[in-house]
Amino acid sequence: VLVDSEILVAKAFAKYMQNFGVDIDEKEFASFAGKKTVQVIDILSKKYSIKDQERFFTNIMDIASNIYKKELTTVKGAYDFVSNSKLNMFIGSNSMKERIIDGLQRVKLDKYFKPEQVYSFDLVDNPKPDPDVYLKDLEDNNLIKTETIIIEDSAVGVMAGVAANVKVIGLTAGGHWHEKRDEKELLEAGAFAVTNDYKKIFKLIESN
């Protein structure tokens, strides 16, 4: 929800899959939103009979890294939200910690998040939609669930937050939320509200 990486990962997969004569549309990528890269690779490998998943992963990471260097930006409104916030903030992600920190550095958000404020799937047993990453964050920092709100941009993430018994705001400001995607996806996953504007997040937090 901070760095606009999902759309860039989609570009990396689209580029790589062309090697197999496969064109993947936005609708198919939307179904992967919030999933770990290795999970997406497993799904595509089985669907399109790609045997070498290790090579698949290495190539995708190389392509994605090159795209990141040139195109990675913050989600619209994210920088202002973070820089103006006096809230106690943490990150809970299905990405790897090293990758998250690198992304924060690239978009100049690293000064707002210390490494210990970043929680990633490699720190827990199960990735989202299981609640492990959020439960670890809550426990490590003695956070009170009723005083905590999670902001998520995927159904997988929303389900993880709800499973952790925390209120979730759905955010559709990222580039992967193309016009054909319906915010109902996040509401049905359990978000109590959905917005496409970071400026509205503070009001939603205050009202809850």
What are these regions (language model features)?
Residues 9-31:
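Conserved phosphoryl-transfer catalytic core
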Residues 66-91, 97, 101:
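Short, acidic loop-to-helix structural element flanking the phosphoryl-transfer center
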